[in-house]
């Protein structure tokens, strides 16, 4: 089966391509680097010709409020139109757990607009909402650092490994569309500030983490400490944080 992964050269997309190729599917990794631009529509028709499934894990290059909304709305419109023309039978999209609760952020407003466009289209679809990735914990620390101190709120947090997200997307791509939303989370629940503290300590990063209930998460002050958690019955990834952290720090210290 021919499957197109839009954003197929990035962290998640490249893993999805690899997993599905191992299952002997014909894979196309579509991205600006391979001549496919979802904003202009360039290369979409050619990439989708003969495909049965499209997996969209693309992300906006600019997270400014206007730019990110333009990216997700325009890309969704172009991708879905190209899929309709190509007769695609299953559109799989990656989104974020808690999107509807984080509408104070321009990024999450744009992700919700993307989801709404998918649901309104005629292409059968599955939206996978995932919690944050372990791989981005360092970025969270960086975005919350001022004068060498990391200030973070004690939000509940159920992150997961990128490998588990890719595995779920690959599994969904091989299955029937649910025409709805599926949630995916890690196997453990933490407080955000404590998890970042553990990550920095293991990475031998000297930054001090201060717990501050009013500190923003990616620029957004969140009053609901459960806003980043999935609902009652998510799919659960296999990788525990300690195991991922051990492997990651071992790679960092290997000459």
Regions found by a protein language model. Give the residues of each.
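Non-catalytic, hydrophobic alpha-helical segments
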Residues: 12, 54, 165-169, 184, ...
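Mobile cap/lid helix-loop segments that border enzyme active or cofactor-binding sites
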Residues: 189, 196-255
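N-terminal Rossmann NAD(P)H-binding glycine-rich loop of SDR-like oxidoreductase domains
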Residues: 1-24
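Conserved beta-loop-beta element that borders a ligand/cofactor-binding pocket
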Residues: 87-90, 95-101, 113-136, 185
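Glycine/proline-rich active-site loop of Rossmann-fold NAD(P)-dependent oxidoreductases
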Residues: 135-141, 145-147, 172-182, 205-207
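A conserved pocket-lining segment of Rossmann-fold NAD(P)-dependent short-chain dehydrogenase/reductase
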Residues: 125-126, 139-160, 164
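Glycine-rich Rossmann NAD(P)(H)-binding loop
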Residues: 152-156, 182-189, 214
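NAD(P)H-binding glycine-rich loop region in Rossmannoid oxidoreductase-like domains
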Residues: 22-86, 97-106
